A protein has these predicted regions:
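Surface-exposed loops/turns
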Residues: 252-253, 335-336, 433
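Histidine-centered active-site/metal-ligand motif
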Residues: 49, 339, 709
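Extended, folded domain segments that form the structural surfaces/walls around functional sites
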Residues: 211-243, 258, 308-309, 317-320
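Long, His/Glu/Asp-enriched segments that create or flank divalent metal/ion-associated functional microenvironments
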Residues: 234-240, 244-264, 269-271, 276-285, ...
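Beta-strand-rich ligand-recognition modules
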Residues: 265, 274-340, 344-368
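Bacterial N-terminal signal peptides
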Residues: 9-20
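N-terminal secretory signal peptides that target proteins for export/translocation
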Residues: 1-6
Length: 825
């Protein structure tokens, strides 16, 4: 009986609630003497967001929607909208929901668009006014560990040594916003500390040129589905096709063995051996050897192993011996340091076009893997050193050994000079006697066990595991009260700036200015930002910020289903990523408006990508900037990179695409879906393949899903003309694609061009989201409600300069959250 009473009570409560939801807004008694803002909330919002719902108890059988409202905890009936300073956190949440008009939910009364926009603008203005009298710059973590990329770059700039960082330390997981430089998730476990200790030892050995304890073999694999019919790399000879060029750091001067393996499929079959071919191996562009193989070519063919008759055909029996496992080898004397090893095929006047299909487990071999197609490079192996001639004159040794002691008496002073120089850059601050003595103690220990170089190696190992190197450390200065805001010092500002733009330590110029206390000067700070953005190290900004903001990093782990999209290969994957990186990098360096991301009529493509997009007249593997005359390819939203990572392996997903745009371009991420959401039905009851729109109509029958999908789905459907690998199409399931949509606020649009216009119609929302992402990345923390006034201030100033990239980046650097910090409470 009690349960029955509870259900009855819930029924009557929901009945009353629904009558409020669907009441005629004009008939509501708004009350006398209330503000327009209070009246609007009472009329359109309080029916769902009130303390009665929030404080109600859970009842068996209640709807998911009712549970969601309770869990949201939003009580707009008790919040004082006339004084938003009392609870700015709540009102910033409201502002975010108002961005795309997601509230009130579909089919509920809502204000007219003018009233809606006026209420949002009023809220933002009041929040900004309240913040101006009590600004909170937020608090970054006191200990901010370098992530994997930052560690690699810091080692590179410190020692002039580019390491394969993945061999030493694992990648870092991104935070909830998609960035892997958030201090809160960059913890240091005992196991990870062991990896850093091991990495320090190996890096120090390599940097000083210590003789390796044993011969090693390093293997560089070439992706199986990389098509090698064209010239692929500028480090390979002009007029060659396919192959690979890899960068390898040789530890010492000496003899090494270079071995090249041909690409095989999943049963070790090597293609192309019925024709005569040549393989060329080079070192830094100089030919080391040419090997003839295949057909009746002279020379030593690759070793064979028998694999049997695959299908019983006479033709296959004839070629069943053509399995290469031994590869091609050359021994060479190499000077220590970074070198480029190339393996490629000299291009013939005419040769067949080979297409290596991806692995199709469970299927027969593709016809394009028959033996009369082009061979390709599968791996390059470096073995050595087979003999050692000495440490050599490597860039890292030249960077480390700023002095060479002529006698034992000169060694202590030389060691002090070397270590003080390295420590200053590694610790990103001036070093004192205690810093230096700790390193000299390790130098002395190493010197007693070997040479002067060994002593420096020991000290370098100690430096690379120091908390001052592995962490960016910020401490509250003395004299600052709990919770007070203060300006960070120039050295902290230098590190914050360099890790924002370069993902690395400050260089000498930046450190010198910081030590002199000049960096906080606004003119000097702006000059440094522009200098750094024009430095080649700023490529890290494109790679890391853009790569994570726009999910480009996800391309490496995204595999469209070969049976559905056989045209997708490694060449296309690389072209997708390169296009977006070059596209955005060009706009930043040209200081264009951020809005150009959406409607630019140019992009960067090569022949492979041009063919995929249907753009004629582009030849060769080199990327070049092209003007577009087809609006289907205008702007970022037409890039294959974004369209692929926001699709499933076997089909497009309006939900993923809509969610991506809401979260990353409009700053209005939808909440997580309720548990146990069923998968989309791909066929109807009659067995007919459903269009995506038909499948989503069924899905939205759940009221708990309808609210979020009201905004996600129209945006996602606008891109439905692009398939799951970004190719334009007019039909799906033998039916014309409907790419039209209506936003919750009533705005109607059609296709990608309509979506672009929709985004450009409210530029502050798009630029504001880019600014939020930039500020998150720059600070290494998520943004809070108290950061939003600073974001809006940056956007307002940027609007005066047509939202140019420089105005937003400089706005971030000059903002209170970037230049200030709040003391521990």
């Amino acid at each position: 009986l009690p349960t029955l009473l509870k259900k009855a009570s819930l029924f009557w409560f929901c009945l009353v609630l629904s009558s409020q939801l669907f009441a005629d807004p004009q008939s509501s008694n708004l009350g006398a003497g209330v503000s327009p803002q209070r009246a609007l909330l009472d009329q359109y919002c309080v029916a769902c967001h009130n303390q009665g719902i929030v404080n109600s108890t859970t009842v068996d059988g209640e709807s998911i929607l009712f549970s969601q409202l309770r869990g949201l905890g939003l009580t707009l009936d008790t919040e004082n909208v006339d004084n938003v300073a009392e609870n700015p956190e709540v009102w910033e949440k409201v502002v975010r929901k108002l961005r795309v008009g997601i509230m009130p939910p579909p089919d509920n009364p809502r204000p007219d668009n003018a009233s809606y926009a006026a209420f949002r603008n009023w809220l933002e203005t009041e929040l900004d006014r309240a913040s101006s009298t009590n600004a909170n710059p937020g608090r970054t973590q006191a200990f901010h560990r370098l992530n994997q990329t930052e560690y690699r770059n810091a080692v590179r700039d410190l020692l002039d040594l580019d390491i394969e960082v993945a061999e030493f330390i694992p990648p870092d997981a991104p935070d909830q916003h998609g960035f892997d430089n958030n201090a809160e998730v960059l913890s240091l476990s005992p196991a990870l500390m062991e990896r850093y200790v091991s990495a320090a030892h190996k890096v120090a050995e390599l940097a000083v040129g210590a003789t390796p304890r044993s011969t090693t073999i390093k293997t560089y694999e070439v992706p199986l589905n990389l098509i090698q019919d064209d010239h692929l790399n500028d480090d390979l000879p002009f007029g060659s096709r396919g192959g690979a060029a890899i960068k390898h750091t040789f530890p010492v001067d000496g003899d090494y063995r270079i071995k090249v393996l041909l690409q095989t499929n999943y049963v070790d079959f090597v293609r192309g051996v019925d024709q005569a071919h040549e393989m060329e191996i080079s070192l830094d562009g100089e030919r080391l050897g040419v090997f003839a193989f295949g057909g009746d070519a002279p020379g030593t063919p690759a070793p064979y192993s028998y694999a049997g008759n695959i299908r019983g055909s006479d033709d296959w029996e004839e070629w069943s011996m053509a399995f290469a496992e031994g590869g091609f080898e050359v021994n060479v004397s190499v000077n220590a340091g970074p070198r480029t090893i190339g393996a490629t095929f000299p291009r013939e006047m005419w040769e067949p076009e080979g297409i290596l299909q991806p692995r199709l487990f469970g299927y027969h071999l593709a016809v394009t893997e028959l033996p009369d197609n082009n061979p390709s490079v599968g791996a390059i192996l470096i073995e050595g050193p087979l003999s050692v001639d000495g440490p050599g004159k490597t860039p890292s040794r030249q960077k480390i050994f700023s002095c060479i002691p002529a006698s034992a008496d000169e060694e202590p002073s030389c060691a002090r000079e070397i270590l003080s120089t390295l420590a200053r850059q590694a610790y990103r601050r001036p070093v004192d006697g205690n810093d230096l003595q700790g390193l000299l103690d390790f130098y002395t220990q190493g010197r007693s066990q070997g040479s002067f170089d060994t002593g420096i190696q020991f000290a370098l190992e100690r430096l690379l595991v120091s908390p001052d190197f592995l962490f960016r450390i910020q401490q509250d200065p003395s004299g600052v009260g709990p919770g007070d805001s203060y300006a960070i010092n120039d050295l902290e500002l230098a590190s914050r700036l360099s890790f924002f733009i370069w993902s690395s330590s400050p260089d000498a110029e930046l450190l010198n200015l910081a030590e002199q206390g000049l960096l906080r000067n606004q003119d000097i700070l702006e000059q440094q930002v522009r200098r750094m953005m024009n430095d080649e190290r700023a490529s890290a900004f494109i790679k890391n910020f853009v790569g994570q903001w726009l999910y480009l990093r996800n391309l490496d782990s995204h595999y469209p289903l070969p049976a559905a999209y056989p045209e997708f290969d490694e060449n296309l994957r690389e072209a997708f990523q390169r296009e977006t990186e070059l596209f955005i990098g060009d706009q930043i360096h040209a200081d264009q408006s951020i809005l150009k991301l959406l409607n630019a009529d140019s992009t960067y493509i090569n022949e492979r990508l041009a063919n995929h997009y249907g753009i004629p007249g582009i030849y060769g593997s080199r990327f070049r900037k092209v003007e577009l005359d087809n609006p289907q390819r205008a702007g970022l939203l037409s890039h294959g990179s974004l369209l692929t990572v926001t699709s499933y392996p076997n089909r497009t997903s309006p939900v993923l695409r809509g969610k991506f745009i809401l979260e990353n371009l409009l700053g209005s991420p939808p909440p997580e879906p309720p548990p146990n959401v069923p998968a989309l039905e791909e066929t109807g009851n009659d067995g007919r393949i459903l269009t995506m729109r038909e499948a989503m109509v069924q899905h939205r029958e759940n009221p708990a899903c309808r609210v979020c999908h009201a905004a996600m789905d129209p945006i996602g459907f606008s891109l439905e003309n692009y398939d799951a690998v970004g190719k334009w199409r007019q039909e799906f399931a033998n039916q014309p694609i409907d790419a039209s949509g209506t936003m919750p606020d009533g705005r109607v649009f059609d296709g990608p061009a309509g979506l672009r216009d929709l985004l450009l119609d409210q530029p502050d929302d798009f630029v504001g989201t880019v600014t939020e992402k930039l500020l998150m990345y720059a600070l290494g923390r998520g943004l809070e409600y108290y950061d939003m006034p600073a974001v809006r201030a940056i956007v307002r100033e940027a609007a005066k300069q047509d939202y140019r990239w420089s105005s937003v980046i400089l706005g971030v650097v000059e903002s209170d959250p970037f230049r200030m910090r709040r003391a521990q409470l």
